[in-house]
Regions:
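Glycosyltransferase donor-sugar binding loop
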Residues: 1-7
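Nucleotide-activated donor-binding/catalytic signature segment of Leloir-type glycosyltransferases, i.e.
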Residues: 7-26
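Short alpha-helical donor nucleotide-sugar binding micro-motif in glycosyltransferases
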Residues: 27-28, 34-38, 53
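Acidic donor-binding loop of glycosyltransferase active sites
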Residues: 36-50, 63
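Short hydrophobic beta-strand element within catalytic cores of glycosyltransferases
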Residues: 64-67, 77
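Conserved acidic donor-binding segment of nucleotide-sugar-dependent glycosyltransferases
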Residues: 79-80, 84-91, 100-106
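A short, well-ordered alpha-helix in the C-terminal region of glycosyltransferases
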Residues: 100, 107-123, 132-135
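C-terminal alpha-helical cap of glycosyltransferases
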Residues: 126-144
Length: 144
């Protein structure tokens, strides 16, 4: 990520006293294991991504997601149901969403997990995404 933004996030983590709780990771080879270790997954990109892959992967593992409110995250995260969307680059909003996520009860987390898994199964399986892509081609390409 961006060094300045990472430093801002680290400062926010310090301000809320969560240094031993929140871990900003670098590259990881075993993402399913990383997701299973997480109570909440953050995808705080400052530039829009075409598809919110991190959010979709985390949701498939039943993890709530806090994501920047732009790009593909708007399709993969349902604000208030499967996670939270925050303005890109707004570390205060990110900290507030994280505070909310970390203070959820077990029952609330379980509800979010069920919603997240259901959302991925309904919209982001390979057959569903292929069907959606083919439907777009069918709509756009002229028939002979």
């Amino acid at each position: 990520g961006r060094t300045g933004y990472r430093e801002e996030l680290e400062a926010q983590i310090g301000r809320i006293g969560a240094e031993g709780i929140i871990h900003l990771t670098g590259p990881c080879r075993d993402m399913p294991a990383a997701y299973m270790l997480a109570d909440v997954v953050i995808s705080a990109s400052t530039d829009p991504e075409a598809f919110g892959r991190v959010a979709a992967e985390a949701h498939a593992m039943g993890r709530p997601v806090i994501a920047s409110d732009h790009g593909g995250a708007r399709e993969t995260v349902i604000a208030g149901e499967t996670g939270w969307l925050v303005p890109p680059g707004d570390s205060d909003a990110l900290a507030q969403a994280l505070r909310t996520a970390l203070t959820m009860t077990t029952e609330e987390r379980d509800t979010v997990a069920r919603r997240a898994i259901a959302h991925v199964r309904e919209h982001f399986t390979k057959p569903q995404m292929c069907a959606s892509t083919l439907a777009v081609y069918e709509e756009l390409l002229p028939r002979k």
